[in-house]
Design a protein with these regions (language model features):
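Rossmann-fold dinucleotide-binding core
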Residues: 4, 9, 94-174
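Structured helix-beta-strand junction loops
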Residues: 23, 42, 55-56, 86, ...
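NAD(P)+-binding Rossmann beta1-loop-alpha1 motif at the extreme N-terminus of oxidoreductases
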Residues: 1-61, 93, 123
């Protein structure tokens, strides 16, 4: 069984976390108590301090912006202060590739693996397990996180090096604007 943490249980994070809860115990954190209560009722283990999420081997993030991801991961009171070596931080936020690479480079100095894995397909696709997941990281890291990503969706692929997932997602969003 995997030691999993999940931060960000909003409109997208909740159904993604629910998929992981089908086969795992998941430690959960969110600033919104209502979001925590919903996931706790589905089996999530509530952590009231961000630092308590650091005990996990795989930490998923699904947050509103890259700036929030940056603050939570490498900020003054961020995860970086408590993460173990060889942990995997998997960012499912619709983020900015430049910020992603910055976070990844800083975490790499602490021997922490960062994967950008944004999703496309909305909350319904997430709940049904068919959402597209575009992972940006080294191939060897992708192979280690792929079993967990496959628990979320059957539609998972490696987009390329760090930042590629977020770049592909941005391109996807841009193309949808013109439809």
């Amino acid at each position: 069984m995997y030691k999993i943490g999940f931060i960000g249980l909003g409109n997208m994070g909740a159904p993604l976390c629910e998929r992981l809860l089908l086969k795992n115990k998941v430690n959960i954190f969110d600033i919104n108590k209502s979001n925590l209560n919903k996931m706790e009722n589905l089996g999530g283990i509530v952590k009231y301090e961000l630092k308590d999420i650091c005990e996990n081997d795989f930490i998923f993030l699904c947050l509103p912006t890259s700036e929030i991801v940056e603050k939570i991961t490498i900020g003054d009171n961020g995860l970086i202060n408590g993460l173990k070596k060889n942990v995997f931080v998997i960012d499912m936020t619709t983020g900015e590739p430049e910020v992603t690479r910055k976070i990844s480079n800083i975490l790499a100095k602490k021997n922490v693996n960062f994967v950008d894995a944004p999703v496309s397909g909305g909350p319904k696709g997430a709940k049904e397990g068919i959402i597209a997941i575009m992972a940006g990281c080294q191939e060897i890291i992708f192979q280690k996180v792929k079993p967990l990503l496959n628990m979320i969706s059957t539609n998972v692929f490696h987009a390329g090096p760090t930042g590629s997932g977020h770049s592909l997602k941005a391109g996807n969003n841009l193309s949808l604007i013109h439809i």
